[in-house]
Amino acid sequence: MTDADIRLNILIFAQRGLLFAVPPSLRAMTCGWSGTTVNVRFVFDGPISEDDKESARIVGTEVVAGFPSPWTLTEEIVRLDYPGDLRSDALPLWVYARKETTTEGLPIY
């Protein structure tokens, strides 16, 4: 699998996983990979409820389900209240970013 294939799979499966799963408090989701490990990072605004954590874990599972064995998943679910800089500790692939006045100029690609 080429890097382009991996990137495309991550983006497609993350988008599918996010359908009907984005709470208002989710500020961003970024992804990346290292070897055969997919890394996902969810950034929330305010307290993170157990329901929010479960939704994030389901999205992560949807992402890694698009890859054959031996691919694995690492998840990071963090609180970074607005207007904290979303670029700090972001992974390279931006899958979702909530509209905020501070999101202008983010590397969305």
What are these regions (language model features)?
Residues 74-109:
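Polar/charged, Gly/Pro-rich intrinsically disordered segments
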Residues 39, 72-74:
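Residues at or immediately flanking beta-strands
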Residues 15-18, 48-72:
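Short, non-transmembrane amphipathic alpha-helical segments
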Residues 1, 29-31, 71:
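Short low-complexity stretches enriched in small and charged residues
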Residues 42-46:
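Short beta-strand-to-loop capping motifs
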Residues 1-11:
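N-terminal presequence-like segments and adjacent domain-start helices
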Residues 21-39:
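Short edge beta-strands and adjacent turn/loop segments
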